[in-house]
Regions:
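Extracytoplasmic
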Residues: 1-130
Length: 130
């Protein structure tokens, strides 16, 4: 597994230092499956269809689904089309793991509402301070 593309060391740190049963982790799409495989609950992974409203809600009489559109929320948050704090509040996110070079990390790394807990050459883990 490539440590450049997957948060190998960050995942080990999370498993050793955080109570994974009691965190809500926002992660990026590309390595969500790796986190999940290692036993870390994720916001999203490569099974994008499972994060559409059709798979996490009920169908209303009008044919619309009432589930959350987690995939769209992820895309809009990661691209900064939506203010990240709105998404984090909506899903009660407690921790964030990001690639250091991500657009979202550029903003969060300068936001006093987040405490950097871990970083390595490629990834960073934050705690969201409410």
């Amino acid at each position: 597994v490539s440590k450049k593309n997957y948060p190998v060391e960050a995942t080990e740190w999370i498993l050793q230092n955080l109570d994974v049963k009691n965190i809500k982790l926002f992660n990026e799409y590309n390595y969500g499956s790796y986190l999940l495989y290692k036993g870390v609950p994720v916001f999203i992974d490569s099974r994008a269809d499972l994060y559409a409203p059709e798979f996490n809600g009920k169908r209303a009489e009008n044919g619309e689904y009432d589930g959350r559109d987690i995939f769209t929320d992820f895309i809009k948050t990661s691209s900064m089309e939506r203010y990240y704090e709105d998404t984090f509040e909506k899903y009660d996110i407690t921790h964030i793991i990001l690639k250091k070079k991500s657009k979202l990390n550029t903003f969060i790394s300068n936001d006093s509402g987040f405490l950097e807990m871990y970083n390595d050459d490629n990834f960073v883990v934050y705690e969201r301070c409410k």
